[in-house]
Amino acid sequence: MRSTTRVGLVVLCVGIAAQVAAHLGDVVLAFWDAQAHLDIARRVIDSTTPGLQMLGTVWLPVPHLLYLPFTQIDPLWWNGLAGGIVGMAAFVLMAVSVHDIVRRRSERAAAAWIAVAIVACNPTLLYLQTTAMTEPLLLGFLAAATARLDHWREGGEDRLLLGAGAWTALAVGSRYDGWFFAAVAAVAVLAISRRIGPVLRFVALPAVVVAAWLVFNAVYFGDPLEFQRGIWSAASQQATLAGEGLLPTRGAPLLDLGYYLGAVGLTSGWLLLAVGTLGSLLALRHREHRVVLLLLWSVLPFNVLALFAGQSAIALPWTDPAGVLNLRYGIMLLPALAVGAVLGLEHLATRRGMLLALAVVGALQVGHFAWNWPAAVGGLREGLAIRDGDAAQMRASRWLATHYDRGRVLVAPAVNISPRTRIRLRDRVYPWTWELGPAALDAPAEVVDWVVVDRRAQGDPVTKAVAADTSFDRRFQLAFRERELEIWQRR
């Protein structure tokens, strides 16, 4: 059996075990974003207005297109496994690619397995790959692209460049980190080949994805840059945070670096951050390691620049304001730290010394995660904070999962309806839903069978509609209440 196959099977078993644990721990749907990703994929078909336009512009489309076939299977959508299947595949891809990179760079087979163990046993990544979050997908695509580029650097075969371009195209269509990686990789290809032909072969597919995204935005939303300057864009959301004084990182490069490295420490591990950084610096002295490490480390300047430009936000437990916002972004540096730690220590110690040093570091890191569980596991800590931060919404979703039987549901904009409720997306009516939304606000009993009201939200159109309907209490009965969150059922 080939070593790549063995790695894939071992990591697959680890991923499956994590999937089981996450489902038993009820954390698969902890992130609101994970639920939204599943719903976006589902609504391309299950919607009052089905079609590709339902992909929207909030997020890039590749993850939702990958989730789409699985979300059409009701049980996989309800329990979140539709996202976990794709996430686990990306998890295996990343581990196999890391093994490929280190095996090619090192003369010791054990070094590649150690790098795999570092990434495959990281608790934040193990958790995220059970969800529909997009970070594992990006890590898988970037690692695969880096492995192909490294292989091309040695052999120079054009098909390897096309393969690297294909993986990069998937990264470009998954997260904007991929756009930065594509630019860095294109420069690397040019520096290695000193010819424009190889660069064009590499960037062809990523360029097609970018062009397709611009055309999609222009055709469906009237602006090719809707994803950047629309009301749901990251820039718009961060502008709101900045207006409230909640974006201290904008325009502060050193602070940005500190924030991002804090997120790395809380997700990838503080010891690994130290050892991986030192190892990478040592490995950079060797020419053959430079391209791989620079590609894997490209996520660092991207995230720092995103914070600097106000396009991203991170909150740490010790910052002001304190929080656990987007801690998961730190996991992007995990492959770079794993590869750097192994390659760097390999040049400092004998095989036995390297194994001993990494075993000690690994034991200390695992002990830290276990001693302060789950606070020391940044991704899980963030997910739990979101899940438990609004207990009313969580209980409302669980109540609907056992009491909802049929009919349309008018939903307040601020309320998140979980896939676990089993309410089809075509039966969810929001104030903006084409034709049905305005009609439901005007006469709820004529359009819907259920109404979800959130009296906490000022100016909520559903709350206003309920208050304005003099016959509402006669036509609907209160079936559930958790603080100001109410669910009404038609009599």
Residue positions per predicted region:
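Short hydrophobic/aromatic helix or loop-helix immediately within or flanking a transmembrane segment
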Residues: D39-I40, L55-L76, A89
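Hydrophobic, aromatic-rich transmembrane alpha-helices
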Residues: L190, Y259-N303, G340-A341, L358-A359
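Membrane-embedded, lumen/periplasm-facing catalytic core of multi-pass transferases
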Residues: V361-N416
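Perimembrane helix-loop-helix junctions
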Residues: H151-G155, L161, F181-V210, V215, ...
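Membrane-lumen/periplasm interface segments of specific transmembrane helices
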Residues: V199-G276, V299-N303
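Short acidic/glycine- and proline-prone juxtamembrane loop motifs at membrane-interface regions
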Residues: W59, T124-L137
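Transmembrane-helix motifs of polytopic, lipid-linked glycan transferases
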Residues: I85-S106, A144, L281
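Signature aromatic-anchored transmembrane alpha helix within multi-pass, membrane-resident enzymes
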Residues: R6-L12, A110, I114, A166, ...
